[in-house]
Design a protein with these regions (language model features):
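Extracellular, repeat-based ectodomains that mediate carbohydrate processing or recognition
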Residues: 1-235
Length: 235
């Protein structure tokens, strides 16, 4: 919402285009964000800047690339961020205090967690986790110092056993550190993961465990992660 106006970003199943739907009190209006190719707007993530304009990260399946779109008044500017193989799955976008975009996303071809940041002149891209694990979802937040924090869920096959985990990657301005918030063997923790930071920067990760069909929250306090069940049968 921007004021009393609802904004929805969605892929048009018939045309394959990425569209922006605006719902006013007196009616609705739709516009095309990106129509270059079919299924251009999969896995969308949206953030609003200080002027109420929308910034979108999404996967273009026609080009197998990560794309970023920015609203400027009534028009949209669209640019390809990363096109190295099949990249851009499960993107999550957040804006810093200067309204610059930060995007976490998955490189499906190499099974990497990647991060892209627009520095005002161009995109900086980095590999954050390259443990060759399947990454199912990402969620990014910017802390009070302007540094990105990323939560993501993975599966890793080792010694004939699948291990599923929720991880947390934190950037301090120089280096990335990676912690495991939750791990277990034999379960299937997949999508539906979301990260938020409280007023003191403490991360809270809500995730859905598809194995037992329950919703959990993981909180980091004093350097230690604790998890608790939020709801049974949440699926």
């Amino acid at each position: 919402f921007v004021g009393d106006t609802m904004h929805v970003i969605h892929a048009n199943a018939a045309s394959g285009m990425l569209e922006h739907m605006t719902q006013y009190a007196e009616g609705a209006a739709a516009s095309v964000v990106d129509g270059e190719g079919f299924n251009v707007g999969l896995y969308t993530s949206v953030a609003l800047d200080s002027s109420g304009h929308q910034h979108i990260a999404y996967y273009n399946s026609s080009a197998s690339s990560l794309v970023y779109a920015k609203q400027d008044g009534t028009s949209w500017s669209v640019e390809e961020v990363d096109n190295t193989a099949s990249v851009g799955h499960y993107p999550s976008i957040a804006l810093d205090g200067d309204d610059l975009p930060h995007i976490a996303y998955v490189d499906e071809s190499s099974e990497y967690l990647k991060y892209a940041h627009y520095n005002g002149a161009g995109w900086e891209i980095a590999i954050i986790d390259d443990l060759y694990s399947n990454v199912f979802d990402t969620s990014i937040a910017i802390n009070s110092t302007g540094h990105p924090q990323i939560a993501y869920s993975i599966s890793n096959y080792s010694s004939s056993t699948y291990e599923y985990a929720v991880r947390y990657a934190s950037y301090d301005g120089t280096d990335w550190s990676i912690e495991t918030a939750m791990t277990r063997a034999g379960s299937y923790t997949s999508s539906s993961l979301d990260l938020a930071l409280n007023g003191t920067g403490v991360p809270h990760i809500v995730y859905y465990d598809d194995y037992d069909d329950d919703l959990y929250i993981a909180v980091r306090s004093g350097g230690t992660w604790s998890t608790s069940k939020v709801r049974d049968a949440a699926g």
